[in-house]
C-alpha cells in the first residue's frame, strides 16, 4: 500500500482464519516516500503468496522476492525509490548471494533459526546492519560454518520441513531528507504533519480516488 496523499484503511484476517482460528505472524514495514512523492495518489498492490517471484535453492529452500532484485530475479511490487524486500527460507548447507546497490542501507533480519551473513552470526530475533557500500552479502547455513554452533543446532532441530533459518533481506537508497512522524503520519516538516491532521479532521485527507 502506498499512502501518498492520504488513505484510510483497515487490516483484518481472512474470513477462514477468523472462523477456524490459529496462529499467524507477519511484518508491517513502513517505507518513507521521497518529499517529491509524498502527495502522489494512493494505491494498493495486492499479491497472493503463490504470485511472488522466487529463486529455488539447492536443498529445497527458496528466496521469495517482493521488491527489488535478488539472485537475478526481480519482485513484482513497484516502489517509488530503489529498495529490496525479500523473504529467505533456507535449509541446511544452502547459500544466498545478495548484490547491494552503491550507498544502499542493507539489513538482514533473522526471525527463525540461525544463519551466517558475510561470516557474522545471525540468530532468531537479531538484525544485522551492514555498511552503506556496494558489494555482495552472502548468507550461508553450512553446518558449523565459521564455528557457528547456532547454525548446526538449528539444523539439528529443523524438524520434518528441514528449515534451518528464515530471514528478511531489506535494503534501500537513503533519502537524506528530514523525517517528522506523529501518529499515523510521516512527513518532512511539522507544518506538514499539522496539515495532515487538519485534512483528516475536515474529511479532505483522502484524495485522488
Predicted segments — roles?
Residues 1-209:
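Jelly-roll (double-stranded beta-helix
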Amino acid at each position: 500500500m502506498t499512502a501518498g496523499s492520504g488513505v484510510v484503511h483497515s487490516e483484518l484476517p481472512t474470513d477462514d482464519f477468523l472462523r477456524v482460528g490459529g496462529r499467524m505472524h507477519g511484518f508491517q514495514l513502513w517505507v518513507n516516500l521521497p518529499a517529491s512523492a509524498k502527495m502522489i495518489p494512493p494505491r494498493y498492490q495486492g499479491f497472493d503468496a503463490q504470485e511472488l517471484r522466487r529463486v529455488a535453492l539447492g536443498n529445497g529452500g527458496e528466496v521469495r522476492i517482493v521488491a527489488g532484485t535478488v539472485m537475478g530475479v526481480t519482485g513484482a511490487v513497484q516502489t517509488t525509490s530503489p529498495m529490496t524486500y525479500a523473504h529467505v527460507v533456507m535449509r541446511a548447507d544452502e547459500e544466498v548471494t545478495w548484490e547491494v546497490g552503491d550507498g544502499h542501507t542493507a539489513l538482514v533480519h533473522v526471525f527463525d533459526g540461525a544463519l551466517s551473513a558475510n561470516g557474522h552470526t545471525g540468530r532468531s530475533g537479531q538484525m544485522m546492519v551492514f555498511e552503506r557500500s556496494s558489494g555482495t552479502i552472502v548468507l550461508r547455513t553450512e553446518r558449523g560454518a565459521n564455528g557457528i554452533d547456532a547454525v548446526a543446532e538449528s539444523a539439528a532441530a529443523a524438524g520434518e520441513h528441514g528449515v534451518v533459518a528464515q530471514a528478511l533481506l531489506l535494503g534501500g537508497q537513503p533519502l537524506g531528507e528530514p523525517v517528522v512522524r506523529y501518529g499515523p503520519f510521516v512527513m518532512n516538516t511539522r507544518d506538514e504533519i499539522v496539515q495532515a491532521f487538519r485534512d483528516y479532521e475536515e474529511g479532505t485527507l483522502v484524495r485522488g480516488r
